[in-house]
């Protein structure tokens, strides 16, 4: 995954707030995955148009006290891609 990669939710997968779980979850045909606050903050920015660099920039602006989230965001998005929650493509 590169910073120029564009990430999007796979068909049938979506992020939503689940009151019963008191957290954000990824819903998908086979079930759901409960997310922590950090994962939800990252995935809220996944829209199929933004690249990884834009997501990182927005999170660095939103959470300046974190001291740079670049590596953590890339690592999480790679895991989300491996879990098949999101797709990753290079811009055309």
Curated annotation (Swiss-Prot):
Pfam families: PqqD. Pathway: Cofactor biosynthesis; pyrroloquinoline quinone biosynthesis. GO terms for molecular function: quinone binding. GO terms for biological process: pyrroloquinoline quinone biosynthetic process. InterPro entries: PQQD, PqqD_bac, PqqD_sf. The keyword Phosphoprotein does not apply. Signal peptide: none annotated. Keywords: PQQ biosynthesis. Gene3D superfamilies: Coenzyme PQQ synthesis protein D (PqqD). NCBIfam families: PQQ_PqqD, PRK02079.1. Functions as a PqqA binding protein and presents PqqA to PqqE, in the pyrroloquinoline quinone (PQQ) biosynthetic pathway. Monomer. Interacts with PqqE. Belongs to the PqqD family. This is PqqA binding protein. It comes from Klebsiella pneumoniae. The lineage of its organism: Bacteria, Pseudomonadati, Pseudomonadota, Gammaproteobacteria, Enterobacterales. The gene is pqqD.
């Amino acid at each position: 995954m590169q910073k120029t990669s564009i990430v999007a939710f796979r068909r049938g997968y979506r992020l939503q707030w689940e009151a019963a779980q008191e957290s954000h979850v990824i819903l998908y045909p086979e079930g759901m995955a409960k997310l922590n606050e950090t994962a939800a903050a990252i995935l809220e920015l996944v829209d199929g148009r933004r690249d990884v660099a834009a997501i990182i920039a927005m999170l660095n602006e939103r959470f300046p006290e974190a001291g740079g989230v670049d590596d953590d965001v890339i690592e999480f998005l790679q895991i989300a891609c491996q879990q098949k929650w999101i797709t990753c493509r290079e811009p055309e």
